[in-house]
């Protein structure tokens, strides 16, 4: 099974991806997480350091694939999750999608691509150009990470459009949305009224999720020292269980940009009844 995780830049895709990977491993699956971001920090939470990228390794070997060994590019992370970072071209040059293609090509050359029960692609940002939509060509399911905010849902809508386009020629389905660090879900609910799709889980607004990223540890690893975090791990285990059940998923219908802008902004600015935010937790959406 191959998964592609997308979402607005900075929404918490890598943290979410790492915890889902560990949850899948705890369900007895052999998991490979592939970071598809030039920042090459997708797997930092699993390994605790920035691992060398495939592109760096290929450059060192003068692009002689036969000189690359699995241990040169595949690193063991927490929970037994194997980790790969695709890397990227020099800033302002080249195509990230090409890098993803080279990564898959090398892993196939190493006979590694088919050794895993689950391969998870963690893909950069919300700009789903043809290049960075490349992981969708390999994926069975797409997962979109969002929050209860306007911008994240706007990005989710564009990603949904990419899933629909790829599904024309590939057996790809959208598994659903994952709400990350949000105390409310009213805008999420409003969005899925317009664009029906499952919501796999909505993670609570707790600082430990953000802290885990800085520490370079998954929530599961942190919970070993602080059992009070076990309940957070259960959210990721629930997502893993839903994915392993091989859901039917959907081929989404995106809403035109202007229509979605109007829908969400009107809902936010004109709620059904007056609401006065009384804490930081309720300020999930900020329009600037």
Swiss-Prot record:
Q: Which reaction does it catalyse?
A: chlorophyllide a + oxidized 2[4Fe-4S]-[ferredoxin] + 2 ADP + 2 phosphate = protochlorophyllide a + reduced 2[4Fe-4S]-[ferredoxin] + 2 ATP + 2 H2O
A GO biological process this protein is involved in? light-independent chlorophyll biosynthetic process
Q: Which domain of life is it from?
A: Bacteria
Q: Which key words tag this protein in UniProt?
A: 4Fe-4S, ATP-binding, Chlorophyll biosynthesis, Iron, Iron-sulfur, Magnesium, Metal-binding, Nucleotide-binding, Oxidoreductase, Photosynthesis
This protein's record includes keyword Membrane: no
State whether keyword Cell membrane applies: no
Cofactor(s) this protein cannot do without: [4Fe-4S] cluster
Enzyme Commission number, as recorded: 1.3.7.7
- One Pfam entry name: Fer4_NifH
Disulfide feature: none
Q: Which residues bind Mg(2+)?
A: 14
Task: Give GO terms: molecular function aspect only.
Answer: 4 iron, 4 sulfur cluster binding; ATP binding; metal ion binding; oxidoreductase activity, acting on iron-sulfur proteins as donors; oxidoreductase activity, acting on the CH-CH group of donors, iron-sulfur protein as acceptor
Q: Where on this chain does ATP bind? A: 10-15, 39, 180-181
Quote the pathway field: Porphyrin-containing compound metabolism; chlorophyll biosynthesis (light-independent)
UniProt-listed InterPro entries: NifH/chlL_CS, NifH/frxC, P-loop_NTPase, Protochlorophyllide_ATP-bd
Entry binding sites for [4Fe-4S] cluster = 95, 129
Report the family membership: Belongs to the NifH/BchL/ChlL family.
Q: By its UniProt entry, which NCBIfam families does this protein fall under?
A: DPOR_bchL (TIGR01281)
What is known about what this protein does? Component of the dark-operative protochlorophyllide reductase (DPOR) that uses Mg-ATP and reduced ferredoxin to reduce ring D of protochlorophyllide (Pchlide) to form chlorophyllide a (Chlide). This reaction is light-independent. The L component serves as a unique electron donor to the NB-component of the complex, and binds Mg-ATP.
**What protein am I looking at?**
Light-independent protochlorophyllide reductase iron-sulfur ATP-binding protein
Species name: Nostoc punctiforme (strain ATCC 29133 / PCC 73102)
């Amino acid at each position: 099974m191959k998964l592609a995780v997308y979402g607005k830049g900075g929404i918490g895709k890598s943290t979410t991806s790492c915890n889902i990977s560990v949850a899948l491993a705890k369900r007895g699956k052999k998991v490979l997480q592939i970071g598809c971001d030039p920042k090459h920090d997708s797997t930092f939470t699993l390994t605790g350091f920035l691992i060398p990228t495939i592109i760096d390794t290929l450059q060192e070997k003068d692009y002689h694939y036969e000189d690359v060994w699995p241990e040169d590019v595949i690193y063991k992370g927490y929970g037994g999750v194997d980790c790969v970072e695709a890397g990227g071209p020099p800033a302002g040059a080249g195509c990230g999608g090409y890098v993803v293609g080279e990564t898959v090509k090398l892993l196939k050359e190493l006979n590694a691509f088919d050794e895993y029960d689950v391969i998870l692609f963690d893909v950069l940002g919300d700009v789903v150009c043809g290049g960075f939509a490349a992981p969708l060509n390999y994926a069975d399911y797409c997962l979109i990470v969002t929050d209860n905010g306007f911008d994240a849902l706007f990005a989710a809508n564009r990603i949904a459009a990419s899933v629909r386009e790829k599904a024309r020629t590939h057996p790809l389905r959208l598994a659903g949305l994952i709400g990350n660090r949000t105390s409310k879900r009213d805008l999420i609910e409003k969005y899925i009224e317009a664009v029906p799709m499952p919501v796999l889980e909505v993670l609570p607004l707790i600082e430990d999720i953000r802290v885990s990223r800085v520490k370079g540890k998954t929530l599961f690893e942190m919970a070993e020292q602080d059992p009070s975090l076990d309940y957070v791990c259960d959210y990721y285990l629930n997502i893993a269980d839903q994915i392993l059940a091989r859901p039917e998923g959907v081929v989404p219908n995106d809403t035109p940009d202007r229509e979605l802008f109007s829908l969400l902004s009107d809902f936010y600015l004109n709620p059904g009844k007056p609401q006065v935010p009384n804490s930081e937790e309720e300020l999930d959406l900020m329009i600037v």
